[in-house]
């Protein structure tokens, strides 16, 4: 069995085990607190009885992450998730706890690691500058999510007995509503927009609740805007892919089958990233969206302009993209974001990001549909109606207020159904103006006698 030996301020759990070759060894495990040593002693004794004892090895967290990425990530992740998770591992996991043995990571170590993350500065990427100096609670949550999954696989592989990240305590971050434009501001922006490409993108984002990557990945074969469709209010489009800038190493690791199409780089020199067409992250993002007539006519006009370019420009690369560049090549999201920023500055518009148009879209669709969550979810592609409720609860609250007002008008306004009456307005009590009274007494001396008699009677 196991026993505890105290060494200075440390506590050691000592026990014997037999390796796979049948050799017997003595093992010492050191802990800083006696309670941790007692807990480990109990685990060892139970493990030896049930033949499930896992003896700590020398595998470090960074070595575990290599196996985790190779054996799990390459089978389960898409190119965008693969790239972002590799960045989290390289920037915030390996530098901080990569050298620690995985068996040394317990719940106390996890709490200390989370505390350390909150004091860690954000690492900027080649293409994105970090808005916050230190790691946000959302990014810390993403890091812990990766580690929870990795250590879950370590339990499955028999490397550790339990997952220390399962009950990690994270700061619950309240959702901050994104600033959005109202309908009047969006009309003003569209009227001020002189860039045809940006004009189409803004209409698709607002009218169809599309993400920018989905707009850039939309192809003409998924857009149904024939005259008969428009006349019958049946114009629609189908979202099933998006444009994404992926790292070449991610595509190489996952295989080219992980993306639908790889666009050749326009640059002659080698690049670390490349634009690709890929499936959306979630199945709920694949959806059919009906198009308002005006937007359908805008798309028809845009397509006619594209067809003229194809005829006049023999170098046009036809990828069948709706929002292609003038040469037919795919458009990077940074191009649209830059044009959108210029429009805001020129038209003196409130500062919002392009994605806010999608939030404006969901907001007005909830209003126009009297809070129909399922209908709005069908257009936005959110994974669940709960996400709509969480993000747009303030809109639903307004509708609930209106509902209470209608309830009052339709039900309680009937006097036969209401015995409780609203309180009657208080009658203002007459006030005595002392100066006026003195002037009246001076004019009518007999009034003074009458007033004195009245006061005398009231005092009895």
Describe the predicted segments one by one.
Residues 3, 69-159, 175, 329-335, ...:
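N-terminal core-binding DNA-recognition domain of tyrosine site-specific recombinases/integrases
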Residues 7-112, 304-317, 397, 412, ...:
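N-terminal DNA-binding module of tyrosine recombinases/phage integrases
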Residues 14-17, 267-276, 282-349:
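Active-site/catalytic core of tyrosine-dependent DNA strand-transfer enzymes
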Residues 123-126, 133-137, 141-143, 156, ...:
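Basic, Lys/Arg- and aromatic-enriched nucleic-acid-binding interface segment
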Residues 156, 203, 207, 214, ...:
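C-terminal catalytic core of tyrosine-transesterase DNA break-rejoin enzymes
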Residues 172, 180, 243-245, 380-406, ...:
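Catalytic-site neighborhood detector that most strongly recognizes the C-terminal catalytic loop/helix
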Residues 222-231, 350-351, 370-393, 419-420:
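Short, polar N-cap/turn motifs at the start of nucleic acid-interacting alpha helices
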Residues 225-229, 233-236, 241-286, 295, ...:
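C-terminal secondary-structure termini that scaffold catalytic or DNA-interacting sites
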């Amino acid at each position: 069995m196991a026993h505890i030996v105290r060494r200075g301020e440390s506590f050691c759990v000592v026990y014997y085990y037999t390796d796979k070759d049948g050799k017997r060894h003595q093992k010492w495990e050191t802990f800083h607190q006696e309670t941790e040593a007692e807990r480990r002693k109990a685990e060892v004794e139970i493990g030896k009885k049930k033949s499930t004892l896992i003896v700590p090895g020398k595998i470090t967290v960074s070595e575990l992450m290599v196996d985790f990425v190779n054996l799990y990530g390459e089978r389960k992740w898409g190119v965008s998730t693969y790239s972002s998770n590799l960045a989290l591992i390289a920037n915030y996991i390996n530098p901080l706890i990569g050298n620690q043995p995985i068996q040394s990571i317990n719940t106390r170590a996890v709490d200390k690691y989370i505390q350390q993350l909150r004091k860690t500065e954000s690492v900027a990427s080649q293409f994105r500058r970090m808005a916050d100096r230190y790691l946000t609670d959302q990014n810390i949550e993403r890091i812990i999510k990766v580690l929870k999954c990795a250590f879950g696989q370590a339990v499955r592989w028999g490397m550790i007995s339990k997952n220390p990240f399962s009950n990690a305590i994270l700061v619950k971050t309240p959702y901050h509503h994104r600033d959005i434009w109202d309908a009047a501001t969006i009309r003003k922006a569209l009227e001020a927009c002189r860039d045809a490409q940006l004009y189409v993108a803004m209409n698709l984002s607002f009218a169809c609740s599309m993400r920018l990557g989905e707009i850039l990945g939309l192809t003409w074969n998924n857009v149904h805007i024939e005259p008969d469709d428009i006349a019958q209010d049946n114009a629609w489009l189908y979202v099933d892919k998006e444009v994404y800038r992926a790292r070449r190493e991610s595509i190489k690791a996952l295989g080219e089958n992980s993306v639908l199409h790889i666009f050749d780089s326009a640059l002659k020199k080698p690049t670390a990233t490349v634009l690709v067409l890929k499936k959306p992250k979630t199945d709920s993002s694949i959806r059919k969206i009906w198009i308002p007539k005006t937007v359908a006519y805008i798309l028809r006009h845009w397509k006619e302009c594209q067809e003229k370019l194809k005829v006049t420009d023999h170098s046009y690369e036809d990828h069948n993209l709706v929002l292609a560049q003038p040469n037919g090549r795919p458009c990077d999201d940074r191009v649209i974001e830059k044009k959108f920023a210029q429009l805001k500055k020129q038209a003196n518009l409130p500062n919002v990001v392009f994605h806010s148009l999608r939030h404006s879209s969901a907001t007005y669709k909830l209003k126009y549909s009297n809070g129909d969550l399922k209908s709005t979810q069908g257009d936005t592609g959110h994974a669940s109606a709960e996400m709509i409720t969480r993000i747009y609860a303030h809109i639903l609250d307004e509708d609930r207020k209106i509902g209470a007002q209608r309830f009052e008008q339709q039900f309680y306004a009937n006097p036969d159904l209401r015995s409780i009456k609203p309180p009657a307005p208080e009658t203002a009590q007459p006030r005595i103006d002392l100066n006026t009274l003195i002037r009246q007494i001076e004019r009518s001396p007999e009034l003074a006698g009458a007033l004195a008699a009245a006061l005398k009677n009231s005092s009895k």
